[in-house]
């Protein structure tokens, strides 16, 4: 079984539409999106997409500002929550599936 992973929900919805136009079963073609847009969430709820990824903008913004402030002060970012090293600060994402999609709608 294959999986189609896309960079965003809009691309995933395009894949859903193309699959439908070509009479491909979405049941056997898991389609994954990113951004948890309204359209993507609706597609997950309708079992057209297997999942979408919610990326918390507030958490990403806070982490970016904290890192920027430390860098301006020439301080280490390694101790920030989610810091992998002096280059990356990871902010957790959340997978949205048919089991939890109602929490995001």
Where on the chain are the PLM-derived regions?
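Sec-exported extracytoplasmic/periplasmic mature domains
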Residues: 16-24, 45-49, 66-73
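Short beta-strand elements at the ligand-binding edges of bilobed clamshell
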Residues: 46-58
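Hydrophobic alpha-helical
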Residues: 1-42
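Electropositive phosphate-/nucleotide-binding environments in soluble metabolic enzymes
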Residues: 9, 55-58, 62
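A generic structural signal for alpha->beta connector loops
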Residues: 28, 48-49, 92
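Short, hydrophobic secondary-structure boundary micro-motifs
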Residues: 3, 28, 52, 79-81, ...
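Residues at the C-termini of beta-strands that transition into short coil/loop
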Residues: 35, 56, 99
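Hinge/cleft segment of the Venus flytrap/periplasmic-binding protein
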Residues: 62-105
């Amino acid at each position: 079984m294959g999986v189609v992973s896309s960079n965003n929900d809009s691309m995933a919805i395009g894949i859903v539409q193309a699959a439908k136009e070509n009479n491909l079963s979405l049941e056997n073609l898991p389609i994954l999106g990113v951004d948890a847009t309204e359209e993507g969430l609706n597609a997950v709820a309708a079992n057209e997409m297997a999942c979408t990824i919610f990326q918390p903008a507030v958490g990403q913004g806070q982490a970016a500002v904290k890192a920027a402030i430390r860098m301006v002060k020439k301080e280490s970012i390694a101790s920030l929550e989610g810091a992998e090293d002096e280059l990356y600060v990871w902010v957790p994402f959340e997978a949205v599936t048919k089991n939890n999609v109602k929490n995001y709608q």
